[in-house]
Amino acid sequence: MIKSELVQIVAARNPHLYHRDVENIVNAVLDEITDALAAGNRVELRGFGAFSVKNRPSRSGRNPRTGDSVFVEEKWVPFFKTGKELRERLNPGMNGNDNGEDD
């Protein structure tokens, strides 16, 4: 699903809202999440998951085409951890027992 499809679905479920307003709301939510992450904050949507940023330290890498060693600079990357309710919905019938044993 892409952003425009999300806007269409939300607008269809909320016929009292203008399509333009739904698009503005979706954009505002995404902008706020992006701004929070850029500021180094964590964004938690209870039951859905949490967005955060993680540091990838600099390292020595390899150019796959030439095999030459290259320096890869340190960078910050977005990270998403799923919430319990989302995991349960994606895996119906699972009882939340994470020990790997069968019931």
Swiss-Prot record:
Assembly behavior: Heterodimer of an alpha and a beta chain.
Annotated organism of origin: Sinorhizobium medicae (strain WSM419) (Ensifer medicae)
Record protein name field: Integration host factor subunit beta
Keywords, sorted A to Z: DNA recombination, DNA-binding, Transcription, Transcription regulation, Translation regulation
GO biological process, one term: regulation of translation
GO cellular component: chromosome; cytosol
CDD domains xref list: IHF_B
Gene designation per UniProt: ihfB
Highest rank taxon of the organism: Bacteria
PROSITE patterns referenced in this protein's UniProt entry, alphabetically: HISTONE_LIKE
One Gene Ontology term of the molecular function aspect: structural constituent of chromatin
